[in-house]
Amino acid sequence: MRKALCLTESLSAIAENSTTLLNLNRRLTGLTRSGENRNALKLFADVHRCTTLRPDQYSVSLAITTARHLRDTIFGGQVHCYAIRSGLLCHSHVSNTLLSLYERLGNLASLKKKFDEIDEPDVYSWTTLLSASFKLGDIEYAFEVFDKMPERDDVAIWNAMITGCKESGYHETSVELFREMHKLGVRHDKFGFATILSMCDYGSLDFGKQVHSLVIKAGFFIASSVVNALITMYFNCQVVVDACLVFEETDVAVRDQVTFNVVIDGLAGFKRDESLLVFRKMLEASLRPTDLTFVSVMGSCSCAAMGHQVHGLAIKTGYEKYTLVSNATMTMYSSFEDFGAAHKVFESLEEKDLVTWNTMISSYNQAKLGKSAMSVYKRMHIIGVKPDEFTFGSLLATSLDLDVLEMVQACIIKFGLSSKIEISNALISAYSKNGQIEKADLLFERSLRKNLISWNAIISGFYHNGFPFEGLERFSCLLESEVRILPDAYTLSTLLSICVSTSSLMLGSQTHAYVLRHGQFKETLIGNALINMYSQCGTIQNSLEVFNQMSEKDVVSWNSLISAYSRHGEGENAVNTYKTMQDEGKVIPDAATFSAVLSACSHAGLVEEGLEIFNSMVEFHGVIRNVDHFSCLVDLLGRAGHLDEAESLVKISEKTIGSRVDVWWALFSACAAHGDLKLGKMVAKLLMEKEKDDPSVYVQLSNIYAGAGMWKEAEETRRAINMIGAMKQRGCSWMRL
C-alpha cells in the first residue's frame, strides 16, 4: 500500500480535486485497512478543522474504528463529542462503532450508558453489549440483558451468549443455551455449530454425535469451518476412526488447508502413520501446506528418509526459516538420532527464540552430549537470552560433572527458578546420578512443595546409590505424608527393585498385595517388576502366575519370564516361552529377548535350539547380533565341548562386531573347563595383550596348566602376576560370625 500523504499534501489534494466526502471516506478506509491508523486520525482531525468539508456519519464511524484499533481513549472521546454536537449519533452504525470502541477500551460503564441512549438498538448493538459484558467479567448483567430482550429470534444473539459462556468457562450453560435455542426453533448457523463442537471432549461424545446429526440435517456439512470443527471434536473425544470418516465423507471442494491441518495434527497426536498419507493427499489437491502443516507432519515422521523429504519440501516452499518449523525440524532429526542434522538446522537460523535454544539443548541431552548442551547454554547466556525452567530441566537431565552441576544450580538461583517444583525435582535427580545422594536428600528436605515426581526421584536416588533401606524409609514417609500422594507404577517398580537388592521376599509379597488392593496390577511396568522380583527371590512359580495374570504383555514381560527360567536353570521352559511368544505374534522379540533365550540355552546345554535361534535373528527378525549374543553362543558351544566351532564363531564375530574381550573370555572359560591347553594358551596371549593388568587371565591360564599337570608352568604364570604389577582381588565374606 502507498504510504499516506503528509498532512499538507492531503489537504491540498482535497482542495485541488474538489474532493467529496466519498473520496475522504475512501482515503480513511484505505489508511485504516493498511494499518496506518495514526495517519488516518491526523487526516480526520485536519479535515474536521477545515471549514470547506464536514465529516459525515461514515467519516465519524471510520474515525471511531481507528481510535478503537489504537485504543486511543482521548481521541475516541473527542470523536464521540463531535458526533453528539453534529447530531450524528442517530445513525446506528455510529452508535454501534462507539459501543465497539468502549468494549475495546474495557469501559463497560460507558458502553452501558451509550447503549441506553440508543432509541432502537439493532442486533449488532445487543450482541456487542452481551459480548462486552462477558469479556469484561459482568456475566450476571449479560444474562440480565438477555432475559429482558424483547426479541431473541436472531441467531447472532444466541451465538453471543453461547460464545460468552464458553469463554467464561460455563460450558454446561453453553450447551443448555444451544438446546434451548433448538427447542425454540431458532436456526443454527455455521458459527454456532463450530462453537458448540469445540466444547465437546471425551465425556460428551454422545452430545457431539447429536450435533453432528443436526449439522447434516441443517445442510452445513458443506461448510469448511463446521467440518473442521467436527473432525476436531472426534479427535478430542479420542475417536480417531470417526474423525477420519468425516474427512473421507467431506466433499473435496469443501476441504481447505485447515481441514488437512486438523486431520494431520490429530493423527500425528495419536502417533498414526496415516498422517503422512493425508499430507500426500493435501499436496495432490494442490493445497499449499502451512507452517502448522509441517510442524504436525514432522512430528509424525518415523522414517529418516521421509523426514528428509519433508524438510526438503519445507525449504522449497520457503518455510524452513519459520522459527516454528525450524524447531520442529530439529526435534524431528533428534528423534532419528541425527544430531548433526539438528545442529546444522540450528546454526543456519538467523533468528532463534527460546524454544530453539531449548530444543538444541534437549537434542544434546538425548545424545548424552552434556558438554555440547552446556556449550549451547553458554552461547545463549552470552547473547542475553533468558532461560526458563525447560532450559534448566534439559541441562540437568544431561550427564554433567559435579562442578558444572553446581554452576548450573547457581544460575538457577540467580534467575529465581529454584522454587519451581520441576527444577527442584531435576536437581534432585541430577545430584543422585552424580553420586551426591546427600545433596539430593538435602534438596528434597528443603523443597517446600513435593509431588510424586519428587518422591520418585529421591527413592530411586537412594536405591541406585546403594542405599536401599533409606529408599524404603522414604517410601514409608510417602505413604504417611500429610498431603495424600498415591505411588504410581514407577514408584512401585522401584520399590520392587529394592526388594530384590535386599533379598526381601516378604516385602515383595507385601508390595504385590498393595498393588492388588489399589488396582494397579493392570500397569505392565509393575507386572514386569513383579516377575523379576519373584524370580530373583527364588520363587519362579510366582513369576509365572504373575505373567499369566497380566492382561497386557510387552516385550519386557516376555523377556523377564525367559530370564527367570534362565536364572533358575530351566532352559527348556525358557525356549518354550520364546516359541509361545513367536506363535502368538503379538510382540516382536528384541535384542534383549535373544540374549535371555541364548543364555538359557547355554546354561541348559541346548546346542541345537541355541544355534537355530541364533541363526534366525537377522534373517527372520531383523535383529542385529551384538556382543552378548556372540558371547552366549560361544559359551554354549564351549560348554558342550565344541571348541573348534566356538573358535570359528569368535572369528566370525570379529568381522561383525570387531574383536571384543567378552567373546574371547567365553572361549577362554571353555578352554579352562575342558583343559584345552593349546587353544587356551593362544586365547590367553590375546587377552593379555588386551587386558594387561587383569590378573584373572593369569589365574585362569595357571589353572589350565595345573589341570594338564604342568606344575612348573602353572607356578611361573602365578609369579608373572606380581611381575606385571597386577594383584588378584582377595576373597572375603560378607557374613559376620
Swiss-Prot record:
<feature type="repeat" description="PPR 11">
    <location>
        <begin position="353"/>
        <end position="387"/>
    </location>
</feature>
<dbReference type="Pfam" id="PF13041">
    <property type="entry name" value="PPR_2"/>
</dbReference>
<dbReference type="Pfam" id="PF12854">
    <property type="entry name" value="PPR_1"/>
</dbReference>
<dbReference type="InterPro" id="IPR046848">
    <property type="entry name" value="E_motif"/>
</dbReference>
<dbReference type="GO" id="GO:0003723">
    <property type="term" value="F:RNA binding"/>
</dbReference>
<feature type="repeat" description="PPR 13">
    <location>
        <begin position="420"/>
        <end position="454"/>
    </location>
</feature>
<dbReference type="GO" id="GO:0009451">
    <property type="term" value="P:RNA modification"/>
</dbReference>
<feature type="repeat" description="PPR 3">
    <location>
        <begin position="91"/>
        <end position="121"/>
    </location>
</feature>
<feature type="repeat" description="PPR 8">
    <location>
        <begin position="256"/>
        <end position="289"/>
    </location>
</feature>
<feature type="repeat" description="PPR 2">
    <location>
        <begin position="56"/>
        <end position="90"/>
    </location>
</feature>
<feature type="repeat" description="PPR 4">
    <location>
        <begin position="122"/>
        <end position="152"/>
    </location>
</feature>
<feature type="repeat" description="PPR 10">
    <location>
        <begin position="322"/>
        <end position="352"/>
    </location>
</feature>
<feature type="repeat" description="PPR 14">
    <location>
        <begin position="455"/>
        <end position="485"/>
    </location>
</feature>
<dbReference type="Pfam" id="PF20431">
    <property type="entry name" value="E_motif"/>
</dbReference>
<feature type="repeat" description="PPR 1">
    <location>
        <begin position="20"/>
        <end position="55"/>
    </location>
</feature>
<keyword id="KW-0677">Repeat</keyword>
<feature type="region of interest" description="Type E motif; degenerate">
    <location>
        <begin position="663"/>
        <end position="737"/>
    </location>
</feature>
<feature type="repeat" description="PPR 9">
    <location>
        <begin position="290"/>
        <end position="321"/>
    </location>
</feature>
<feature type="repeat" description="PPR 7">
    <location>
        <begin position="223"/>
        <end position="253"/>
    </location>
</feature>
<feature type="repeat" description="PPR 17">
    <location>
        <begin position="554"/>
        <end position="588"/>
    </location>
</feature>
<feature type="repeat" description="PPR 6">
    <location>
        <begin position="189"/>
        <end position="222"/>
    </location>
</feature>
<dbReference type="InterPro" id="IPR011990">
    <property type="entry name" value="TPR-like_helical_dom_sf"/>
</dbReference>
<feature type="repeat" description="PPR 15">
    <location>
        <begin position="488"/>
        <end position="522"/>
    </location>
</feature>
<dbReference type="InterPro" id="IPR046960">
    <property type="entry name" value="PPR_At4g14850-like_plant"/>
</dbReference>
<feature type="repeat" description="PPR 12">
    <location>
        <begin position="388"/>
        <end position="418"/>
    </location>
</feature>
<dbReference type="Pfam" id="PF01535">
    <property type="entry name" value="PPR"/>
</dbReference>
<dbReference type="InterPro" id="IPR002885">
    <property type="entry name" value="Pentatricopeptide_rpt"/>
</dbReference>
<feature type="repeat" description="PPR 19">
    <location>
        <begin position="626"/>
        <end position="656"/>
    </location>
</feature>
<feature type="repeat" description="PPR 16">
    <location>
        <begin position="523"/>
        <end position="553"/>
    </location>
</feature>
<feature type="repeat" description="PPR 5">
    <location>
        <begin position="154"/>
        <end position="188"/>
    </location>
</feature>
<feature type="repeat" description="PPR 18">
    <location>
        <begin position="590"/>
        <end position="620"/>
    </location>
</feature>
<comment type="similarity">
    <text>Belongs to the PPR family. PCMP-E subfamily.</text>
</comment>
<protein>
    <recommendedName>
        <fullName>Pentatricopeptide repeat-containing protein At3g49740</fullName>
    </recommendedName>
</protein>
